[in-house]
Amino acid sequence: MKFVPDDPDQQSDVPFLEDARADDGWKGQSTSKSIEQLRAEISAEIGRLGGTMTRFMRGEYEIQGQKRPGAIIEYNIVSLDGQGFRGRIDVAGLPFEKSKGRQDSERTNRNRRDKSLQMALFNIREGLQGSRILQTLSPGYAALVPWLLTDSGQTFGQLWREGLGTAALPAPTKDGEVVEAEFTEIDD
């Protein structure tokens, strides 16, 4: 499976696995959870968000010439009126420095590949947990919507990132402020 972004310039700087630091926001560097354990925890989080994981497939992405271990997570959600929707979370682990020339380099590279995917899945699970809390605290937020699939096979998030869903900024009010939403304050 090869993934090639439409606009490689949109890719942010991605650190190598060995350079990912906790103080830069990366988590899961020292997780001892297996890929299967993390898959099960992600499935449970998707369930708590109202979806059902239907597929987990390991593979490899190629992004800007770098091979990155990854996975595709597919799920279904059903709306209140009973209509079903499919979603997909594409997970690309961090690239890693490949060991060459050593007798155990194949095993070392396999371990690094697994570690990269474990760390990526750990962060996806953390993100889904955070989304669940946000869904509880923010009325109208639907955590699984960005990964719903369109008729073209792209997710809503991919379309948005490509600029197809970006709306123009609203016009400023008379005092120069941009109002995107309004709410009513209720006195206790």
Question: Where are these predicted regions, by residue range?
Answer:
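Intrinsically disordered, low-complexity regulatory regions enriched in serine/threonine/proline
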Residues: 1-3, 7, 89-188
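Compact, well-ordered interaction domains used in eukaryotic information-processing assemblies
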Residues: 34-88
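Terminal, regulation- and interaction-focused segments at domain boundaries
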Residues: 1-44
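Short, flexible coil/linker segments at or flanking structured domains
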Residues: 21, 42-44, 63, 105, ...
